[in-house]
Amino acid sequence: MLQAIYNETKDLMQKSVQALNRDFSTLRSAKVSVNILDHIKVDYYGTPTALNQVGSVMSLDATTLQISPWEKNLLKEIERSIQEANIGVNPNNDGETIKLFFPPMTTEQRKLIAKDAKAMGEKAKVAVRNIRQDANNKVKKLEKDKEISEDESKKAQEQIQKITDEAIKKIDESVKNKEDAILKV
């Protein structure tokens, strides 16, 4: 019973950490990642479709991405979607592929993006604390319903706190690593 609560809590907290790392992949660091385009949708025959599902996206170097659509008639639509996404770059359409040349980031831009990373980390910590609160409430309900003793309840809450501390530590490490990657010149 308590083990199920621990397992569920650990699983939900791991998912929060994974979601944070997924969100981090959309932030730009010193080297441009293809993941920066993950949120862009292209109108594919009337259906909003992820950019990486209508063509291949690859990194040519630290500041250049290339998109090769599987259907050449999508070039204009992809170009329009990128412009509307407002990611700070103008698409360069050569009739075969679209190249995105990202300018080097200024120190000010790096600091702003690092600040965004920190805010994402704080959001993840709030999610983890909410998961802890839910788990503690389940334990307190078991105690109230006389299914576990007060001592078992206290031990269970301590165990939940340990799981929470581990998740918060992972979040802090992820934030620090991302900030370092962003601020690295």
Curated annotation (Swiss-Prot):
It comes from the Bacteria. Keywords: Cytoplasm, Protein biosynthesis. GO terms for molecular function: ribosomal large subunit binding. CDD domains: RRF. GO terms for biological process: cytoplasmic translational termination. It holds the Pfam family RRF. Gene3D superfamilies: 3.30.1360.40, Ribosome-recycling factor. GO terms for cellular component: cytosol. It is found in: Cytoplasm. Disulfide bonds: none annotated. Residues 138-158 are annotated as: Disordered. The keyword Protein biosynthesis applies. NCBIfam families: frr (TIGR00496). Belongs to the RRF family. Responsible for the release of ribosomes from messenger RNA at the termination of protein biosynthesis. May increase the efficiency of translation by recycling ribosomes from one round of translation to another. This is Ribosome-recycling factor. It comes from Helicobacter pylori (strain HPAG1).
